């Protein structure tokens, strides 16, 4: 089980919800256990209508929670697990919080796709709370600066993960490991297919 009671990300989450008190937020994390613990940790800090959405709920409960989130007077925060959010679209919401990140960039694209749908009239704001020097921060930096995952769909994102996975994991475990060379190489590899495509026109 997880204990987020002293996690600085919960304090950050409380603040962003208070600062944007008219907006709705979709939060996605990897597991059903995390959804429950995030909800519990928030309850002690802020009074906000919150719905959860995960694979342990039956279809009727999921539909009900999704409808409550879609309602103008309903939940302002929907806390979703990875599997629970599959196949659902929430294009009426523009704030996406990635509480954690999967190592596979295609899964990140799927998360963004929950909001980035036909009918989305706003720019999507992606929030990624990280703890300094954590694995999560390194993964976020690699995705942002190396793969540009949060800005565009990456053709061949999976092959880039295969190519750099071991070095990425090594950077998680080795505190001295500098991420900059890996980011630089990844960016070069990501841009090569684009250059070939341009030349092939």
What do these predicted ranges mean?
Residues 35-39, 79-93, 112-120:
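SF2 helicase motor core recognition
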Residues 32-34, 57-59, 83-86, 102-105, ...:
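Conserved nucleotide-binding/hydrolysis micro-motifs of P-loop NTPases
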Residues 48-82:
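Conserved helicase ATPase core of P-loop NTP-dependent helicases/translocases
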Residues 88-101, 125-128:
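A short beta-strand element within the Helicase C-terminal
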Residues 29-53:
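Conserved helicase motor "Helicase C" RecA-like lobe of SF1/SF2 P-loop NTPases
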Residues 104-126:
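Conserved SF2 helicase motif VI
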Residues 1-8:
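Interdomain linker/hinge connecting the two RecA-like lobes of the SF2 helicase core
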Residues 122-201:
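C-terminal accessory region of SF2 helicases/translocases
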């Amino acid at each position: 089980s997880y204990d987020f009671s002293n996690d600085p990300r919960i304090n950050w989450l409380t603040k962003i919800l208070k600062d944007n008190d008219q907006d709705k937020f979709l939060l996605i994390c990897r597991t059903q256990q995390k959804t429950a613990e995030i909800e519990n940790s928030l309850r002690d800090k802020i009074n906000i209508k919150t719905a959860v959405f995960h694979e342990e709920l039956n279809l009727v409960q999921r539909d009900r929670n999704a409808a409550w989130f879609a309602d103008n007077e309903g939940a302002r925060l929907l806390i979703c697990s990875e599997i629970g959010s599959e196949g659902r679209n929430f294009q009426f919401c523009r704030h996406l919080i990635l509480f954690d990140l999967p190592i596979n960039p295609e899964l990140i694209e799927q998360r963004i796709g929950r909001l980035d749908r036909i009918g989305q009239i706003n720019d999507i704001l992606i929030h990624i709370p990280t703890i300094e020097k954590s694995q999560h921060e390194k993964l976020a930096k690699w995705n942002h600066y190396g793969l540009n995952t949060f800005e565009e769909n990456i053709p061949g994102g999976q092959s880039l993960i295969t190519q750099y996975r071991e070095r990425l994991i090594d950077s998680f475990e080795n505190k001295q490991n500098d991420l900059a060379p890996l980011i630089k190489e990844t960016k070069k590899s990501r841009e090569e297919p684009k250059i070939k495509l341009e030349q092939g026109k």
